[in-house]
Amino acid sequence: MNKFAVVEKQFEYKGHDCICIFGCLGYRCGYVSVDDNKEFNEYDIECHCGLSFSGTLPYDYGQKETYYIGFDCGHICDGNDYNLALKYGLIDEKRFNELLEMQILSPTFLQPVRSLEYVEEQCKKIVDQLEKENESNE
């Protein structure tokens, strides 16, 4: 098991492999497979706070393709769910207490934690934009 993150959901949408993970820092990320190896900043894609990843994923994410683009929900407008990180075994009790103390002082303290459903919808939104771009290039 990857001690940095767990895969909460993996699904196929319009031929793209989509992976939603929850990480040890208490927030989710979403990844979508792509056929090209462009950098994330070369895409004109709207999603939660913009794309922040392009590349290969860790082997234990169970990826079905080679290259992915993705986004994270670890921004100033996002909250952290350290309870879930503890439940998933991504952090221990000591780290949980440290993070909780720091969180109270953080500007993200009262921000919403992005749900699995939200991340799934953002992945679909990315795919829809990729497909629309492919149609206009044909």
What is each of the regions a protein language model found here?
Residues N2-G50:
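Amphipathic, interaction-prone secondary-structure segments
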Residues K9-E12, N41-E138:
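Polybasic, proline/glycine-rich intrinsically disordered low-complexity segments
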